[in-house]
C-alpha cells in the first residue's frame, strides 16, 4: 500500500478561513444598514424581514442586477471601493420606478481566488449604497470558484426587495398628453455602456489618467451610480407622479417607452441640458453617432419623471431642496399608431 497525500479544500483552491475572515470584516457593514423590520443578523440560512407597519395592502417588488463590464475597468484600475455602490444603485433605482421603498438587499460575490481586502472593499461599498437608499444589507454569498475566473477577477450581482402600497403603484398608466417631464442628473455613465467605453479606450489608445474637466477620465468613468431613492420617495409623497424611467441599458430610446401608454410620445428638448464632459469625450474619441449615444448611454440623465404640468414647479423646487440637479426636459404629446414614442429635438 502506497502513501497518498491528504488533500484539502484549500489544496483545491478554496480557502474557507479566508471566507470566514471576510465575514468578520463585513459584520459591521451590515449592522450599519439595519432596519427595524429585520429579524436576526448575518450567518443564518435565510434572512428574515417583516413588512413595515402602516401598509394596508403591501405589494413586494423585487429586482436583480449587476455592474456589467464597468467591473472590468474597476478591476484593471484596482478601484474596488465604489462598485458596490453601483450594484445597489442599479437595483434600488429600478424599484423606485414603481414607487417602492427598498427594504433589504443581498449580494453575490464570485471569484477565482478570494482576496479578503478586495472583497471587503466591495462589500463596504455595498453597505454605503444601502445606507444611501435606506435598505438593509441582510446577507449574501461569497463563492470562491477556482478555474471559473481568471486569477483574482470577480463578478458581483445584487438582489433587492421593496414594498409599495397596492393603490400607489406607479405603472405609467396615468401618463397623458400635456404631462411635463423632469430630468434628474446622472453622476456619469452609471453602470451601462461600458463594453463600448472599453472598446473606445482600446481603439483610441487613450490614457485614462488624462485630465477631464476638474477630474480624470478614469474617475469620470468610474464615478458611482447616483442613488435617487430618498428624494424620489419624498417627491412621490408630495406630488402626483405618473411615471418614472430609470435610464439604463438601451438609453433614452428603450427605457422611456417602457413606462408610456400606447399612442403617447415623449418629446425631449436636447437644448435643456449640456452633456457632461465624459460623454462628449466618448462620442468624439469613438466617433459615435448621436443616435448610438442616446441608445447606449444616459448622456447625463439618470432618471426621467412624468407628472402633470401644474406640478412641475413644485416638484423641481422639492428636488433641488433635496440636493438633486433637476430640470424640465420635455413633455408628453399624442402619437399616431406606429409613430416613435421618443423624439429628441
UniProtKB/Swiss-Prot annotation:
Q: Which UniProt keywords apply?
A: ATP-binding, Cytoplasm, Ligase, Nucleotide-binding, Purine biosynthesis
Question: Which catalysed reactions does the entry list for this protein?
Answer: 2-formamido-N(1)-(5-O-phospho-beta-D-ribosyl)acetamidine + ATP = 5-amino-1-(5-phospho-beta-D-ribosyl)imidazole + ADP + phosphate + H(+)
Keyword hit for Repeat: no
EC class, as a word, reads ligase
Q: Name one GO molecular function term.
A: ATP binding
The annotated pathway is: Purine metabolism; IMP biosynthesis via de novo pathway; 5-amino-1-(5-phospho-D-ribosyl)imidazole from N(2)-formyl-N(1)-(5-phospho-D-ribosyl)glycinamide: step 2/2
Q: What subcellular locations does the record give?
A: Cytoplasm
Which InterPro entries does this chain map to? Answer: PurM-like_C_dom, PurM-like_C_sf, PurM-like_N, PurM-like_N_sf, PurM_cligase
Q: What is its EC number?
A: 6.3.3.1
One Gene Ontology term of the biological-process aspect is: adenine biosynthetic process
Any keyword Transferase? no
Q: Which Pfam families match?
A: AIRS, AIRS_C
Give GO cellular component annotations, separated by semicolons.
Answer: cytosol
Concerning PANTHER family, the annotation shows: TRIFUNCTIONAL PURINE BIOSYNTHETIC PROTEIN ADENOSINE-3, TRIFUNCTIONAL PURINE BIOSYNTHETIC PROTEIN ADENOSINE-3-RELATED
Q: Which family does it belong to?
A: Belongs to the AIR synthase family.
Q: What is this protein called?
A: Phosphoribosylformylglycinamidine cyclo-ligase
| Protein source organism | Aeromonas hydrophila subsp. hydrophila (strain ATCC 7966 / DSM 30187 / BCRC 13018 / CCUG 14551 / JCM 1027 / KCTC 2358 / NCIMB 9240 / NCTC 8049)
Amino acid at each position: 500500500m502506497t502513501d497518498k497525500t491528504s488533500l484539502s479544500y484549500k489544496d483545491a483552491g478554496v480557502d474557507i478561513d479566508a471566507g470566514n475572515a471576510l465575514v468578520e470584516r463585513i459584520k459591521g457593514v451590515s449592522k450599519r444598514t439595519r432596519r427595524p423590520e429585520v429579524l436576526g443578523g448575518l450567518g443564518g440560512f435565510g434572512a428574515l424581514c417583516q413588512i413595515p407597519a402602516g401598509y394596508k395592502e403591501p405589494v413586494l417588488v423585487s429586482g436583480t442586477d449587476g455592474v456589467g463590464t464597468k467591473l472590468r475597468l474597476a478591476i484593471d484600475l484596482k478601484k474596488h471601493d465604489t462598485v458596490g455602490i453601483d450594484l445597489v444603485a442599479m437595483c434600488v433605482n429600478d424599484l423606485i420606478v414603481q414607487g417602492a421603498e427598498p427594504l433589504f438587499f443581498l449580494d453575490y460575490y464570485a471569484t477565482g481566488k478570494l482576496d479578503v481586502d478586495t472583497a471587503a472593499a466591495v462589500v463596504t461599498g455595498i453597505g454605503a449604497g444601502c445606507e444611501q437608499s435606506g435598505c438593509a444589507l441582510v446577507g449574501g454569498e461569497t463563492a470562491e470558484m477556482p478555474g471559473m475566473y481568471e486569477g483574482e477577477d470577480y463578478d458581483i450581482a445584487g438582489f433587492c426587495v421593496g414594498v409599495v402600497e397596492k393603490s400607489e403603484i406607479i405603472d405609467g398608466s396615468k401618463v397623458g398628453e400635456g404631462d411635463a417631464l423632469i430630468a434628474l442628473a446622472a453622476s456619469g455613465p452609471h453602470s451601462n455602456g461600458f463594453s463600448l467605453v472599453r472598446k473606445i479606450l482600446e481603439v483610441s489608445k487613450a490614457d485614462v489618467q488624462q485630465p477631464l474637466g476638474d477630474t480624470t477620465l478614469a474617475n469620470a468613468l468610474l464615478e458611482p451610480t447616483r442613488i435617487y431613492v430618498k428624494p424620489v420617495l419624498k417627491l412621490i409623497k408630495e406630488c402626483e407622479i405618473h411615471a418614472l424611467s430609470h435610464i439604463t441599458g438601451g438609453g433614452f430610446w428603450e427605457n422611456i417607452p417602457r413606462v408610456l401608454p400606447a399612442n403617447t410620445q415623449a418629446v425631449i428638448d436636447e437644448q435643456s441640458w449640456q452633456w457632461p464632459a465624459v460623454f462628449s469625450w466618448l462620442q468624439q474619441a469613438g466617433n459615435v453617432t448621436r443616435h448610438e449615444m442616446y441608445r447606449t448611454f444616459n448622456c447625463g440623465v439618470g432618471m426621467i419623471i412624468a407628472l402633470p404640468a401644474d406640478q412641475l414647479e413644485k416638484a423641481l423646487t422639492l428636488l433641488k431642496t433635496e440636493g438633486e440637479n433637476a430640470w424640465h426636459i420635455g413633455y408628453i404629446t399624442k402619437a399616431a399608431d406606429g409613430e416613435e414614442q421618443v423624439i429628441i429635438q
